[in-house]
């Protein structure tokens, strides 16, 4: 269900497995509740991941720590980087996706042309063969389904994300790869490779991840 990546005085960082609920539902514990049971402490969620998404999550150990992380996330001071795989040729191979988002049908969201309160996403991509590209994504906002909608909007829904038109696969190929933030004047950086997924373990993907080990040091495409 999850792996503990770091256990600090005020927070833990875990790697959530794919296809695991964030919140408890249908009588089964979500990842936060399960971590609380395992560790025997109260944990506070400060951001979330969709069920299909694997990767890094910060869980605070106190309401004070949660308030600080919530402030940082709301002010976009936590840098987040994601990996995704998608089939097909995108409308552009790198750059940004920007636009307002709105609810659509079947729990979906859609990208609009308006810019009143836009979702902003920067990205790079690299071909890994068989018509598949690996995407490194940096969301500058935190909208629901933002990255899933961003890739679908440029013609390449995430592999395994059938809600947005992706081909069926062994998992949804979206992974929260890296986090950078400061807490109590100390800098923290965490990165973890995808824990599952046949396509994530291909030699071409593994080779490209060597080039993206420090995403915060890359020269990212400018966002308008």
Language-model segments: which ranges?
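Glycine/acidic-rich beta-strand-loop module
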Residues: 41-75
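A short alpha->loop->secondary-structure connector
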Residues: 28-31, 73-80
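Short, solvent-exposed secondary-structure boundary/capping segments
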Residues: 131-137, 202
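Residue-level signal for inorganic ion chemistry
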Residues: 15-16, 58, 84, 123, ...
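Glycine- and acidic-residue-rich catalytic/RNA-contacting loop of pseudouridine synthases
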Residues: 20-32, 68, 85-133, 149, ...
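S4-like RNA-binding module at protein N-termini
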Residues: 1-26, 34-39, 63-64, 70-71
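Pseudouridine synthases involved in rRNA/tRNA modification
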Residues: 1-2, 6-10, 17-22, 150-224
